[in-house]
């Protein structure tokens, strides 16, 4: 991997939703602030050595806003694209503030980001993206019946799932590139970006969906010609035979090797797919691992590093 002096192109860092709100934690602002403080410390360590662009998850937050909206009977619930924009602004604000505190004198910019999807994407007919809090099976079944939700298992719990179409084009890409070139640390494409389609008049129109943040991060990194992609989560890498006595972490591997295995669709699977796409398309590296090991992952000393 190149040093910042040799390669001024950015590293794109994608924060997992657990970096903002850990499983089982109440979604209170003070708790999220504390988690974001920890995340900002890790990002700042990288940003002192490399140009950085940050993306983040929003699953718990967008689900909470959806629940709050359904409790307000005086107006119709807001659609998911609007809720996604709200969370992108909220989380971006908290991240930007913490990063400015950690990197005094550094320009940090949060940018709402629209990402075009295909209105004919089959994902609209088969919801797979978990959002909101976790439920027991009984609770989830009751909510599905009352509110018309699709539900799916998420580990030992259950969550609401919504459509997650493939990201195709980033509307604000030229602006993001301009900000990166200026030396700013950019927070963008939060929660996978705001899903939009091109309507018959050639304009943009929001759609009810949540784009996978890791696939959006891979597209962003490819478009920015990033020197690397860093997918940070709460586990220390990608494992073969995860959850068994024969679990083995891939330290350095290739897309070809990873595609021989099946990974959980609701957790590590999207990260593996995003890593493979980015490496196959660009010939650059992608690291997957724990937030507090970010620099070690870049140096090949921790996590799973996917190489061409």
Region annotations inferred by a language model:
Residues 2-308:
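C-terminal catalytic "cap/lid" subdomain
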């Amino acid at each position: 991997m190149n040093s910042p002096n040799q390669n001024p192109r950015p590293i794109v860092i994608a924060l997992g939703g657990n970096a903002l709100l850990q499983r089982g934690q109440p979604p209170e602002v003070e708790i999220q602030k504390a988690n974001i403080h920890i995340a900002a410390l890790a990002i700042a360590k990288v940003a002192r050595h490399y140009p950085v662009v940050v993306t983040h998850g929003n699953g718990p937050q967008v689900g909470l806003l959806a629940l709050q909206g359904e409790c307000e009977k005086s107006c119709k619930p807001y659609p998911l694209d609007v809720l996604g924009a709200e969370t992108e602004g909220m989380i971006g604000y908290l991240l930007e503030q913490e990063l400015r505190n950690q990197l005094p004198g550094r320009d940090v910019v949060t940018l709402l980001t629209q990402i075009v999807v295909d209105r004919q994407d089959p994902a609209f007919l088969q919801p797979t993206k978990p959002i909101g809090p976790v439920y027991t099976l009984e609770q989830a079944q009751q909510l599905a019946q009352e509110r018309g939700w699709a539900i799916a298992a998420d580990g030992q719990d259950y969550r609401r799932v919504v459509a997650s179409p493939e990201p195709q084009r980033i509307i604000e890409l030229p602006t993001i590139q301009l900000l990166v070139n200026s030396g700013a640390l950019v927070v963008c494409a939060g929660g996978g970006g705001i899903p939009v389609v091109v309507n018959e008049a050639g304009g943009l129109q929001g759609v009810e969906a949540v784009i996978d943040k890791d696939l959006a991060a891979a597209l962003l990194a490819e478009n920015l010609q990033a020197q690397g992609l860093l997918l940070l989560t709460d586990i220390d890498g990608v494992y073969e035979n995860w959850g068994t006595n024969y679990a083995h972490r891939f330290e350095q591997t290739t897309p070809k090797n990873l595609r021989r295995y099946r990974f959980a669709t609701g957790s590590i699977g999207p990260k593996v797919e995003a890593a493979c796409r980015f490496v196959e398309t660009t010939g650059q590296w992608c690291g997957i691992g724990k937030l507090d090991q970010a620099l070690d992952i870049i140096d090949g000393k921790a996590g799973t590093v996917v190489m061409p």
